[in-house]
């Protein structure tokens, strides 16, 4: 199982939100690329980077900060937030991103995502409130169940699905294993758990399930609840 340290970008700074509320943003670093170097030193292989401003605006906002992060280490980077057309996919891959996350567009234009997955390394991001897909930086909730959307990409060739339980995100209340397994089983695609990881026991529960391909760790690290060096030793 892979562990993805998370860097969420708002106005070029690394922040964490609670339940996706931009007003709750807490700044953890004014130089996100330095965080990337720290994670690399701990033994990370991947980074999970989100342009929060981009997710809400529907367009790329923190491109320069993302480029600095990518150029500062040898880590593989998956990037999401406001990527809704082929030009933006190519732009991120051209600066060295390893794969791109398509979120809102997966609900609104699933055929576009399938086409892109044939050409580029694409990850689908599915964010859910009470089991239903949320889009536009989590500001809107649809009538489609997350598992139903996941099933649409079972044979699309996407590299992974990231599933986030919004109610858990940034709350340090424990990961939603049942939801993660529901997505993994509905899609048959490598599934990455996101939202609510509180400590090492959560990571081990996901690993021990044998059905989860990865986990994203954000606030639990920034608030000192998880020793990432130890986590990488135990899991990778």
From Swiss-Prot:
UniProt-listed Pfam families: His_biosynth
GO cellular component: cytoplasm
EC number: 5.3.1.16
Classification via InterPro entries: Aldolase_TIM, His_biosynth, HisA_bact_arch, Isoase_HisA-like, Isoase_HisA-like_bact, RibuloseP-bd_barrel
BP term (GO), one: L-histidine biosynthetic process
Main location: cytoplasm
Listed name of the protein: 1-(5-phosphoribosyl)-5-[(5-phosphoribosylamino)methylideneamino] imidazole-4-carboxamide isomerase
Species the sequence originates in: Campylobacter curvus (strain 525.92)
């Amino acid at each position: 199982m892979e562990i993805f340290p998370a860097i969420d970008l708002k106005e070029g700074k690394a922040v964490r939100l609670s339940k996706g509320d931009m007003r709750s943003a807490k700044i953890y670093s004014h130089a996100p690329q330095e965080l990337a170097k720290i994670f690399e030193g701990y033994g990370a292989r991947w980074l999970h980077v989100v342009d929060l401003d981009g997710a809400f605006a529907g367009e790329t906002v923190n491109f320069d900060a993302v480029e600095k992060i990518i150029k500062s280490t040898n880590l593989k980077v998956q990037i999401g937030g406001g990527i809704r057309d082929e030009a933006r996919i190519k732009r991120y891959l051209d600066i060295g991103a390893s794969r791109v996350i398509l979120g809102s567009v997966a609900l609104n234009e699933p055929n576009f995502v399938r086409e892109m997955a044939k050409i580029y390394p694409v990850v689908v991001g599915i964010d859910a409130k009470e089991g239903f897909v949320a889009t536009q930086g989590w500001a809107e909730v649809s009538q489609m169940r997350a598992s139903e959307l996941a099933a649409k990409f079972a044979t699309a060739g996407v590299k992974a699905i990231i599933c986030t339980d919004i109610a858990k995100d940034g709350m340090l209340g424990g990961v939603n294993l049942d939801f993660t397994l529901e997505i993994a089983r509905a899609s048959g695609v490598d599934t990455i758990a996101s939202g609510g990881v509180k400590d090492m026991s959560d990571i081990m529960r996901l690993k021990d399930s044998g059905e989860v391909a990865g986990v994203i760790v954000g606030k639990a690290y920034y608030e000192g609840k998880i020793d990432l060096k130890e986590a990488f030793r135990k899991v990778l």
